[in-house]
Amino acid sequence: MSEEHVHLDESEVYHIRKQKLAELRTSGFNFPNTFRREHLADALLKQYSETEKQTLEQKHVKVSVAGRIVLRRIMGKASFFHIQDVSGRIQVYLRSNDLPDVYEQFKHWDLGDIVGVQGELFKTNTGELTINAEHVELLTKSLRPLPDKFHGLADQELKYRKRYVDLIANEDSRKTFLIRSHLIKAFREFMDDNHFLEVETPMMHPIPGGALARPFVTHHNTLDMTMYLRIAPELYLKRLVVGGFERVYEINRNFRNEGISTRHNPEFTMLEFYQAYADYNDLMNFTEQLFHYLCDKVLATRQIEYQGQVIDFNKPFERLSVKEAILKYHPDIKAQQLETVEGCRTLLNDLDLPYKETDGLGKLQIILFEETVEHQLFQPTFITEYPTEISPLARRSDTNPEVTDRFEFFIAGREIANGFSELNDAEDQAERFRKQVEEKDAGDLEAMHFDSDYIEALEYGLPPTAGEGIGIDRLVMLFTNSQSIRDVILFPHLRQ
């Protein structure tokens, strides 16, 4: 029975294919692993698509390919079928006269089955590059049907839960994750070329730190101690700078026990790096160079279309302080209103934006910025002068101790990177940790713990240093024009 021409539900197809597999086992089929592929579909198409039909026949090009059957047309004593490998698709021509036994078996194979094919290249009368099969071998029997070839896997939730099916059915999904891989490779190339050392730091921490976030908690049975999945590698990377590794980076996962949205996944990938004898201005310049390199290397263009608008990486990236950004996008607000707690509270009340009575001036300014300005920063923009009270690891500004030498980098209305000149004064850092502990005791679940070992490391001396973290998932969203972070994570977190 050919299921392509009969409307069957998935359970019926599964039952029929199980029967086919049982019959195959009886005849000796055991999922063989002796076939060796020598060619990829895309490479063959690139090499021979422009070759004239007659010239190709004279060359007698022998090939060996393997992949999944994704399309087939059975026509009496001859059939065409397409196989799909990691690179693309190629057509195969199979004749009963050439391989009578295999042809009879082929008629009972199904879409989704994985086969190995050896044969000679030729072109059909319509000019399509095709393999004239001389050997065809079933390698894997597929028991479940592929999604409808015209509609693919349309259910978004199902795409995320069954990514393996999504990758089979949707070329766009495969392209997204290829771009992701190329992007991470380009990150590494740029960092290595700039003399940064790639390192690995712990994923389980005895004390959570490095960011303001709620951690995932676990327990180490042998040591009988509470451990935390890391929310950031920052404090360990800076320990390495203390130890003498002056340029370090890490690409790895962070975990934050927070909400899930189109921009947030509890498990996400970051590039984090630290450079001794540099400040946050150096890192902003470095970031511009990095993004130029990524655009050139991965997309071969510095203008990217995202959700119907063009992001231009060619122009110098705009730089605004938090206050300047608020005033730019709220021309009705007066600068002096941002200088007092009462003025900021009035602005937030007028906009019906919530805040805590204990929030200081800097926190109130940030609420106003995040809720009303951030989403408008579409072109690449650095926002600087973040308040000290929300930047416990950043160095204070020499000209205004109420703000820090810190920036956040925004594209398409979302934060892509966060960087600052590092606080290397052990006594100042200890005092800020103490204030964080007070906030935690007052109910702030995201406030930091006091990390005495990190303070001790600073007491040995951290050179003037700047550090930055870049969210790779969000950047992949931009580079692939994806609306949701789930579209760029192979196996995103979902409700059970």
Swiss-Prot record:
> Which residues make up the binding site for Mg(2+) 1?
408, 415
Cofactor(s) required, per the database record? Mg(2+)
Domain of life here?
Answer: Bacteria
**Protein location:** Cytoplasm
One Gene Ontology term, aspect cellular component: cytosol
Note describing how the cofactor binds:
Binds 3 Mg(2+) ions per subunit.
List the PROSITE patterns hit by this protein, alphabetically: AA_TRNA_LIGASE_II
Spell out the coiled coil positions from the record. none
Give GO MF terms, alphabetically.
ATP binding; lysine-tRNA ligase activity; magnesium ion binding; tRNA binding
* GO annotation, biological process: lysyl-tRNA aminoacylation
What keywords does the record list, in alphabetical order?
Aminoacyl-tRNA synthetase, ATP-binding, Cytoplasm, Ligase, Magnesium, Metal-binding, Nucleotide-binding, Protein biosynthesis
Question: Reaction(s) catalyzed by this protein?
Answer: tRNA(Lys) + L-lysine + ATP = L-lysyl-tRNA(Lys) + AMP + diphosphate
Report the EC code(s) recorded for this entry.
6.1.1.6
Gene3D superfamilies per the UniProt record, alphabetical: Bira Bifunctional Protein, Domain 2 (3.30.930.10), Nucleic acid-binding proteins (2.40.50.140)
Q: Where does Mg(2+) 2 bind?
A: 415
Broad class of the protein's primary localization: cytoplasm
User: CDD domains given for it?
Assistant: LysRS_core, LysRS_N
Alphabetized HAMAP family for the sequence: Lys_tRNA_synth_class2
| Record family assignment | Belongs to the class-II aminoacyl-tRNA synthetase family.
Tell me, how does this one assemble? Homodimer.
This protein's name: Lysine--tRNA ligase
